[in-house]
C-alpha cells in the first residue's frame, strides 16, 4: 500500500529478462539463435553480452550504447506471484534504422519480439521477418495500447492474464474458463494463434476457430 514499508527475506541480482531467457533456452535446445538489441555501457551490459554468448547465443547485433542497461525490479510474494517495475535503459534506444541495419543478415524461421523496445523498432522487425516468410511471436509485455494495430500482423501472441485484460481494456480472467474467452477475444484482434499464460493454472489458447485450456504440470520445489 502507498506509504507502507515491508521487510523482504532476500535480495538477488541476476541477468535475465524474457528475451534473454528465451534466447538462452532456445540455444541450449540446439537451435541457432541471434539476439538483436542494445545494452548499456555499464558493467551489467558487459555481463549480459558475455553471459548470452556463453549460452551459445550470437550477440553480433547486440549493440552497446551510452547509459545504463535495461533493468527490472521484481518483487516475489511467498505465494510465488510477482510484480515487475521496468526501467528501459538501453532498450529504449533500439530504433527503426539501427533495427533495419542489424536485423539478422540471413533469414530466420521465427522472430520473437517483446514490448520492452519501441513499437517502431518492433514494426520494422515484423516487416522484415514477414518479407521472407518467417513467423513472428509477440510477447506483449509490458502491455501497451500502441500495439492494437500491430496485432493483426502477428502470427503468435503470448500474454499473461493481467496483460490480456489490459490489452482488451477489461478485468483479467478469474478462471481458466474466462481465460479461454479472453484468448478468443484476443484472437479476434488478428493474431493467428494466442496463448494466455495463467501461472499455476496453466494456459488458455485460441487458434483459428478452436480454443481450450492446458493445465500446468504439477512439480515439486523448483530448484532453478
Model-assigned labels for residue ranges:
Residues 123, 130-213:
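Conserved phosphate/ATP/ADP-binding segment of small-molecule kinases
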Residues 56, 90-97, 136-143, 216-217:
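Short gly/ser/thr-rich secondary-structure transition/capping motifs
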Residues 38, 61-64, 74-115:
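Conserved phosphate-binding/catalytic loop of the ribokinase/pfkB sugar-kinase fold
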Residues 1-38, 43-54, 215, 219-222:
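Glycine-rich phosphate/adenosyl-contacting loop at the front of the ribokinase-like
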Residues 24, 71-75, 83-84, 202-206:
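Short beta-strand scaffold segments in enzyme catalytic cores
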Residues 51-66:
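A glycine-rich helix N-cap at a beta->alpha junction
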Residues 26, 111, 156-160:
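Residue-level signal for inorganic ion chemistry
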Amino acid at each position: 500500500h502507498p506509504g507502507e514499508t515491508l521487510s523482504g527475506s532476500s535480495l538477488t541480482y541476476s541477468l535475465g529478462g524474457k528475451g534473454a531467457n528465451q534466447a538462452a533456452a532456445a540455444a541450449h535446445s540446439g537451435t541457432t539463435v541471434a539476439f538483436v538489441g542494445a545494452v548499456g555501457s555499464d558493467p551489467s551490459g558487459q555481463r549480459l553480452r558475455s553471459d548470452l554468448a556463453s549460452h551459445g547465443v550470437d550477440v553480433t547485433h547486440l549493440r552497446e550504447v551510452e547509459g545504463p542497461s535495461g533493468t527490472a525490479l521484481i518483487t516475489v510474494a511467498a505465494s510465488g506471484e510477482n510484480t515487475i517495475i521496468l526501467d528501459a535503459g538501453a532498450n529504449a534506444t533500439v530504433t527503426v534504422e539501427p533495427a533495419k541495419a542489424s536485423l539478422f543478415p540471413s533469414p530466420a524461421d521465427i522472430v520473437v519480439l517483446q514490448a520492452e523496445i519501441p513499437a517502431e523498432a518492433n514494426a520494422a522487425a515484423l516487416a522484415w521477418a514477414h518479407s521472407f516468410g518467417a513467423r513472428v511471436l509477440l510477447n506483449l509485455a509490458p502491455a501497451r495500447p500502441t500495439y492494437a494495430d500491430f496485432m493483426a500482423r502477428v502470427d503468435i501472441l503470448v500474454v499473461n492474464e493481467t496483460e490480456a485484460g489490459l490489452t482488451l481494456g477489461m478485468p483479467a480472467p478469474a478462471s481458466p474458463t474466462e481465460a479461454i474467452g479472453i484468448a478468443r477475444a484476443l484472437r479476434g484482434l488478428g493474431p493467428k494463434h494466442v496463448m494466455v499464460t495463467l501461472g499455476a493454472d496453466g494456459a488458455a489458447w485460441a487458434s483459428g476457430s478452436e480454443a481450450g485450456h492446458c493445465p500446468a504440470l504439477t512439480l515439486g520445489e523448483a530448484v532453478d
